């Protein structure tokens, strides 16, 4: 199966992530490809993850701001629960009464490293759509860096902020809203669904159409067939 998430910004920036995964009893990442480029991001970056071999390739610009590209390739021992590109999919499949769910993620900082995501439901919150009242489950996703780096990250101001996601439950769960950064050290963006807007069309004069349709009706017997 394939999941793709694309954000196109007004300034021309693009966030494009495609994840290929299997869904046999459990979700299993096969391949993930992330591209971030444009003024909205500090540095353009491209990350490729091969779930079968553990190879992770990160392409980004140097910190000195020059145009030259830096490529880092590493092999990681990827656990079966690695969730790059699958977080929203997983949230729509997690039981809302689960106390906490933990999954793994490859973080490009820019050197690839494994971190944990701790997903905790915070209860239901009301919202409305089309005049109809609904309730969405509010999830908090916390990044656990682990090791010595995890111990000093909060002290150095490098602990990533929590991600907040709201999911509409039911037989067909759906994403409602999220508040999260799209890259390490980036601002928190609010992402939510919007209603489609159609171009204004002139009002249809149904009475005129009815009269026009009536005027083209042939009287009885007007149509005949000659042999």
Language model regions located:
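Acidic, serine/threonine-rich low-complexity disordered tracts
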Residues: 1-51, 99-227
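Surface-exposed beta-loop interaction hotspot
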Residues: 59-99
């Amino acid at each position: 199966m394939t999941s793709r998430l694309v954000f196109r910004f007004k300034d021309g920036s693009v966030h494009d992530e495609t994840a290929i995964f299997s869904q046999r009893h459990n979700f299993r990442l096969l391949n993930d490809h992330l591209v971030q480029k444009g003024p909205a991001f500090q540095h353009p970056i491209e990350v490729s993850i091969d779930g079968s071999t553990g190879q992770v390739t990160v392409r980004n610009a140097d910190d000195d701001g020059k145009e030259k590209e830096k490529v880092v390739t590493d092999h990681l021992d990827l656990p079966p629960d690695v969730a790059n590109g699958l977080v929203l999919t997983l949230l729509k499949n997690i039981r809302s009464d689960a106390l906490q769910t933990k999954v793994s993620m490859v973080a490009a900082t820019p050197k690839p490293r494994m971190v944990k995501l701790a997903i905790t439901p915070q209860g239901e919150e009301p919202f409305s759509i089309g005049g109809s009242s609904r309730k969405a489950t509010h999830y908090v996703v916390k990044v656990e860096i682990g090791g010595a780096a995890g111990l000093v990250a909060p002290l150095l101001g490098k602990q990533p902020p929590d991600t907040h996601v709201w999911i509409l439950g039911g037989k067909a769960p759906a994403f409602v809203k999220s508040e999260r950064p799209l890259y390490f050290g980036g601002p928190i963006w609010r992402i939510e669904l919007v209603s489609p807007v159609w171009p204004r069309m002139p009002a249809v004069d149904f009475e005129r159409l009815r009269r026009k349709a009536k005027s083209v009706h042939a009287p009885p017997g007007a149509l005949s067939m000659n042999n």
